[in-house]
């Protein structure tokens, strides 16, 4: 007499079958051809990661209000924010004179020691410092951030 094995499906109590694969996490990936309303987790920024903490904790200096001043790392935060702004402007092709922005940040930093009453320090010259990020030349064709595009436009 011949024995026939029956296929049981995704029943958790059945024996493991090589025909049915369950996704990690134990859910079922069985579909009858129509989309069931499943709730996707909503993330504000798909590039955000919880490695660095929540986005509210790690706001850039340009996102902070002008009245809130941190104690020590304000200059570093402002320079990193300025570099991010420079890189976004370089990718868009719209170049602005960044020396004026650098002067504004320097004036804010040079006014702080005078307001604290430390007259022992030497006065800092207000000479403009060249920006560390030089604007890149505008390419004749733009490629997407990931590499080359197969789309040819003239």
UniProtKB/Swiss-Prot annotation:
The modification Phosphothreonine is found at residue 54. Residues 125-138 have a biased composition (Pro residues). The modification N6-acetyllysine is found at residue 148. Residues 1-19, 47-59, 80-91 have a biased composition (Polar residues). It is found in: Nucleus; Cytoplasm. Residues 60-71 have a biased composition (Low complexity). Induction: Induced by EGF growth factor at mRNA and protein levels. Induced by androgens. Negatively regulated by the microRNA miR-132. The modification Phosphoserine is found at residues 28, 31, 71, 80, 87-88, 92, 131. The modification N-acetylthreonine is found at residue 2. Expressed in testis, skeletal muscle, thymus, prostate, colon, peripheral blood cells, brain and placenta. Keywords: Acetylation, Cytoplasm, Nucleus, Phosphoprotein. InterPro entries: JUPITER (IPR033335). The modification N-acetylmethionine is found at residue 1. Pfam families: JUPITER. Belongs to the JUPITER family. Interacts with the complex composed, at least, of APC, CTNNB1 and GSK3B; the interaction takes place with the inactive form of GSK3B (phosphorylated at 'Ser-9'). Modulates negatively AKT-mediated GSK3B signaling. Induces CTNNB1 'Ser-33' phosphorylation and degradation through the suppression of the inhibitory 'Ser-9' phosphorylation of GSK3B, which represses the function of the APC:CTNNB1:GSK3B complex and the interaction with CDH1/E-cadherin in adherent junctions. Plays a role in the regulation of cell cycle and cell adhesion. Has an inhibitory role on AR-signaling pathway through the induction of receptor proteasomal degradation. This is Jupiter microtubule associated homolog 1. It comes from Homo sapiens (Human). The lineage of its organism: Eukaryota, Metazoa, Chordata, Craniata, Vertebrata.
